[in-house]
Amino acid sequence: MIIPDLHTIMPIIITGVGALVVLLCGPLLLSGTTSSIAAVTAAAAGLWAIFTAPSAVPAVAGLTFTPLAQFLIPLFCAAALLTLLLSHGYNENRAIKGEEYPATVLFALFALCVLPCASNLLILFLAIESVSFAFYILVTMDLQRAESGEAGLKYLLMGAVAAAFTAFGFALIFAGSGTLELAGAVPHADNRAIVAAGWGVVIMGMAFKLSLVPAHLWTPDVYQGAPAPVAAFLSTSSKVAAASLLLMLLTFSPPMPELRIPLVLLSLLSMVVGNLAALRQQNIKRMLAYSSIAHMGYLTLALLTGTREGYAALLLYGAIYTAMNLAAFGAIASLSLEKERDQIADYSGLGFSAPLRGGVLALAMLALAGLPPTGGFIGKFFIFYSAIKGGETALAIVGIISAAVSSFFYLKVVASLYMHRSSSPAPRAAAAADAVALCCAAAFILLLGVFPAPLLRLVDAALQ
């Protein structure tokens, strides 16, 4: 390795150094400065990744800036940046003070940047678990709410189980293949059984991370108890990271028919159970939690195809889903400055009294339902198209039906925003940071709905 090689992993270095600076120097800085430094750090890391050419040469042992990393790192940085912007006004009205919050967001981003660059199983495991550790802390940050601590404890306990599954699975893959390198951890005639078993255990571990049924029970409580901006970051970046881990392993592995049945069951149950459970929810965060279970079922369907089209659909939908959930939870956070608005009924008439935030929330609901001309429609179209083309027609039909059913509970939120009046006073005006973040997420959703070609080209390049 020579020093110039390090420029390809500068996003990792930038986020790591930025997190340490915010944490160590925070007590010496003015209030609010740490959040600004963290936001600039996330933006700088994302821009560096965009303008750095991928390389097949490892920058350091175990870390290579691949085309996939060039796609995912800016996505993670954008999610972290919008989360920090949305957190500014929300945290001022909560007991979430000091430099710990922005520093922990940057530590999570650091691990997220490491993950797509990893070229061996050990670094991959450390990266995905470091992401989880950061979120255990972030979920419990709202000290004024007992639900926040309860959510963090539940997430920690379930995360420990997921970590055990993942570690055991990687150990089996290592035992069978004799190497930690991703390129060498493939099944052969003499080691197929043990490597396939390792794969099965890793999939179960990632099922916890992705909230796939039956490993989904922690999700509604954690989303409900977490601060809304944290729920936005958790429901997007951690999910895309877990799906990307499976994608990275699959791209190095030949098809393994024995894994098809577990993936089919995980996808089928998640799409059906997630959407049916969401129908009964009156709490908007729990509704979005169950809907995220269904959306992860769609991602698993794309992964199941084992085709380039399926993997492209996974990355495309991951990017669009990030924007949709950031918009949804961001609007919830901005509308909950004075008090938590947990129930769908709490949003009655807010489409008129808070038109920007109500409009963004309505747009996010329409996009999550997959209605045109939003990015959600484009994402679902490519998911189901790739599934049908990959021979999973029956599962695609189930997915289409479940997506149609989901329109009911998404439109229920839109109806509450615009078809009901409320006697409650209008919410406080949106902070400038909230407005910028929400407008960026909404613009991304709309632009991808009418002009998805640029993102499709980026996805194609990421799979080279």
UniProtKB/Swiss-Prot annotation:
Its main location: membrane. One of its GO terms (molecular function) is NADH:ubiquinone reductase (non-electrogenic) activity. The chain crosses the membrane at residues 9-29, 39-57, 65-85, 98-118, 121-141, 156-176, 193-213, 230-250, 259-279, 287-307, 312-332, 358-378, 394-414, 436-456. It catalyses: a quinone + NADH + 5 H(+)(in) = a quinol + NAD(+) + 4 H(+)(out). Keywords: Cell inner membrane, Cell membrane, Membrane, NAD, Quinone, Translocase, Transmembrane, Transmembrane helix, Transport, Ubiquinone. It is a multi-pass membrane protein. NDH-1 is composed of 14 different subunits. Subunits NuoA, H, J, K, L, M, N constitute the membrane sector of the complex. This is NADH-quinone oxidoreductase subunit N. It comes from Citrifermentans bemidjiense (strain ATCC BAA-1014 / DSM 16622 / JCM 12645 / Bem). The gene is nuoN.
